[in-house]
Amino acid sequence: MGLGGYWSEVLDVLRDIIPVYDKVNSFISLGKDEEFRTRGLLGRVKEENAILDAGSGFGNMSKTASKLCGNDLKITLYDPLIPMLKNTKKFFEIPPALASGVFEHIPFQDEKFDAVICGY
């Protein structure tokens, strides 16, 4: 189930692109990454929601959600790469909770979150 034994290879590739992560996101979306995030979140995430940003990277989806809903969101960033999570707090007025792991083993109780978001 999931990536299993391939996780180490995937993590190696992701570590390599950390310095250019945001540029890659912009490039592969033809510069429409923020627009696509907004369209995906609009009307789906509401003020005071507890959200899990799964595979959060630098928290781009959560940053967009915060712009749309204000700072009343309770955000948890979840990513397998600790280096991606390390510098995220500086991007948020209210620092999000941070957790590291893979999707196959999400360590949260059922119904802890009002919404789970996942994007690039």
Where are the regions a protein language model picked out?
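Conserved donor sugar-nucleotide recognition element shared by glycan-biosynthetic enzymes
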Residues: V10, D33-R37, L81
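Class I SAM-dependent methyltransferase Rossmann-like catalytic core
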Residues: I18-G31
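Conserved alpha-helix/loop element of class I SAM-dependent methyltransferases that forms part
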Residues: G31-E47, T64
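Class I SAM-dependent methyltransferase SAM/SAH-binding core
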Residues: L52-H105
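N-terminal, positively charged/glycine-rich alpha-helical extensions of SAM-dependent methyltransferases
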Residues: M1-V20
